[in-house]
From Swiss-Prot:
SUPFAM superfamilies: Ribosomal protein S7. The lineage of its organism: Bacteria, Pseudomonadati, Pseudomonadota, Betaproteobacteria, Burkholderiales. GO terms for cellular component: small ribosomal subunit. CDD domains: uS7_Bacteria. PROSITE patterns: RIBOSOMAL_S7 (PS00052). HAMAP family: Ribosomal_uS7_B. It comes from Methylibium petroleiphilum (strain ATCC BAA-1232 / LMG 22953 / PM1). This is Small ribosomal subunit protein uS7. One of the primary rRNA binding proteins, it binds directly to 16S rRNA where it nucleates assembly of the head domain of the 30S subunit. Is located at the subunit interface close to the decoding center, probably blocks exit of the E-site tRNA. Part of the 30S ribosomal subunit. Contacts proteins S9 and S11. GO terms for biological process: translation. The gene is rpsG.
Length: 156
């Protein structure tokens, strides 16, 4: 394919209930097979549960959870002289957000509660308090970067 120009980023509209763009992006991450109404029901159900359990603004809990899960550094493989090194690199802001959303979704899926809305609600609550599967994943990525700090001079 020709590489003439940079493809413009799509404008994502804020979600109808809270008017938040990040929540709208998260809805797209949760969505499967183009079923946006189902994803919407899951997310709004989860946020209602969060409000009941935590007695806090659900949007605030969601944003706190996202910010807690965002990774600062990650490792990338780099081949130097016949050996592969795991080189720690800083994560770009857009990727940081995407990874946080993906990890929240994955760790919510792995939970044992009945409905996805309940799983997501509990995962968001735990992540906002610095616990849970998504936080574990973030800490693991940070630990890998810390362990391979010696190779940080092999920058990309």
């Amino acid at each position: 394919m020709p590489r003439r120009r940079e493809v413009p980023k799509r404008e994502i509209l804020p979600d109808p209930k809270f008017g938040n763009v990040d929540l709208s992006k998260f809805m797209n991450v949760i969505m499967e097979s183009g079923k946006k109404a189902v994803a919407e029901r899951i997310i709004y159900g989860a946020l209602e549960t969060v409000e009941k359990k935590a007695n806090r603004d659900p949007l605030e809990v969601f944003i706190t959870a996202l910010n807690n899960v965002k990774p600062m550094v990650e490792v990338k493989s780099r081949r130097v002289g016949g050996a592969n090194y795991q080189v720690p690199v800083e994560v770009r802001p857009v990727r940081r957000m995407a990874l946080a959303m993906r990890w929240l979704k994955e760790s919510a899926r792995k939970r044992s509660e009945k409905s996805m809305a309940q799983r997501l609600a509990n995962e968001l609550l735990e992540a906002s308090e610095g616990r849970g599967g998504a936080m574990k994943k973030r800490d693991e990525v940070h630990r890998m970067a810390e362990a391979n700090k010696a190779f940080s001079h092999f920058r990309f």
